[in-house]
């Protein structure tokens, strides 16, 4: 059987479209399930933004496999209810609350100090909390909501916990201690420069809140790569991921017309529920495959697939962002000068 050139081109284009949709939405058949999570007894995990959505499912499944799990968030009353839900489902669960307000650098610092006072080890850190497309507003620290919540505060929190992570890694096999950054394919919405160093707040950018969200997610991915390079000698793995397009509260700030379009169109069938949405996070946090295949610094897409970054970046740019961000917190006296 022979095909015309146009017919072959159509097939290639169709395949590309299907693969892109699978990468964006996570509609591929999972090669990995919750049953593949190894026993985590004796391990300590921390999940930010775990009161609902994929953060809740991530914390629940880590607890189900025996880990002691810290739920990090702002509203203690809300989290007490979440902890009860987890206890009701997993009777043997070891769940703790850690107060963390990502809109306040001082709260981030205090949260890290509180955790360090309670625990000597940390095996799994999942930087999951996020905010998407809110109206333009600055935090008390002077940063736009998305860049602070999604990137800056997670950067500070992670850097403060690095001594604990390194100490934990001394007694573990390479790759058993992991930092997971829940990013998004929306990193493609970042400004042309990727990161706008003159003003991270992007107050006048043409695409507004979407570009600000994209920049915050791109920064997360680049930070993950920077950490992977810095921490490999300690046996600590840092990875990032796009969890898929998920039905969660994250979209609460999205334009009403956009949500209605999703709900009333074929795109509603492309949305993942939080259970499937959490699969990639849990794969990144626990799968032995990642250590076995030396996937430190990797970027994953839904569901539990190795992804490809579609924006060019080099080591110099990654390092520039790392040092630029570190300097912010050096000046605020939250971090010591970077070596």
From Swiss-Prot:
Key words of the record: NADP, Oxidoreductase
Pfam families for the chain: adh_short
Entries under InterPro entries matching the protein: NAD(P)-bd_dom_sf (IPR036291), SDR_fam (IPR002347)
Any GO MF annotation of the entry: oxidoreductase activity
Gene3D superfamilies per record: NAD(P)-binding Rossmann-like Domain
Active site positions: 213, 217
Positions annotated to bind NADP(+): 54, 78, 101, 128, 213, 217
UniProt KW Transferase keyword: no
NADP is among the record's keywords: yes
Signal sequence coordinates: none
Family, as annotated: Belongs to the short-chain dehydrogenases/reductases (SDR) family.
Xref: PANTHER family: RETINOL DEHYDROGENASE, WW DOMAIN-CONTAINING OXIDOREDUCTASE
Protein name (Swiss-Prot/TrEMBL): Uncharacterized oxidoreductase C736.13
Source organism: Schizosaccharomyces pombe (strain 972 / ATCC 24843) (Fission yeast)
């Amino acid at each position: 059987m022979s095909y015309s050139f146009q017919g072959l081109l159509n097939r290639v284009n169709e395949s590309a479209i299907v693969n892109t949709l699978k990468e964006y939405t996570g509609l591929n058949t999972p090669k990995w399930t919750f049953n593949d999570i190894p026993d985590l007894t004796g391990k300590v995990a921390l999940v930010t933004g775990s009161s609902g959505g994929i953060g809740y499912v991530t914390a629940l499944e880590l607890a189900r496999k025996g880990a002691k799990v810290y739920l990090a968030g702002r509203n203690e009353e809300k989290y007490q209810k979440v902890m009860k839900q987890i206890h009701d489902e997993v009777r043997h669960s070891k769940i703790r609350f850690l107060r963390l307000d990502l809109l306040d650098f001082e709260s981030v610092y205090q949260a890290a100090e509180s955790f360090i006072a309670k625990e000597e080890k940390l095996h799994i850190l999942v930087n999951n909390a996020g905010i998407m497309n809110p109206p333009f507003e600055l935090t008390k620290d002077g940063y736009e909501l998305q860049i602070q919540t999604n990137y800056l505060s997670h950067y500070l929190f992670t850097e403060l916990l690095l001594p604990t992570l390194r100490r934990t890694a001394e007694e573990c096999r390479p790759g058993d201690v992991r930092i997971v950054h829940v990013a998004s394919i929306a990193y493609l919405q970042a400004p042309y420069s990727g990161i706008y160093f003159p003003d991270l707040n992007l107050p006048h950018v043409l695409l507004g809140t979407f570009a600000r969200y994209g920049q915050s997610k791109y920064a997360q991915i680049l930070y993950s790569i920077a950490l992977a390079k810095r921490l490999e000698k300690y046996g600590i793995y840092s990875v990032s991921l796009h969890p898929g397009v998920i039905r969660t509260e994250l979209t609460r700030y999205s334009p009403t017309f956009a949500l209605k379009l999703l709900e009333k169109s074929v795109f509603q069938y492309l949305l993942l529920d939080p259970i499937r949405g959490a699969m990639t996070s849990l794969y990144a946090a626990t799968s032995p495959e990642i250590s076995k295949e030396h996937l430190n610094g990797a970027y994953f897409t839904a569901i539990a697939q190795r992804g490809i970054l579609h924006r060019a970046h080099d080591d110099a740019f990654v390092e520039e962002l790392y040092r630029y961000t570190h300097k912010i917190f050096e000046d605020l006296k939250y971090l010591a000068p970077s070596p």
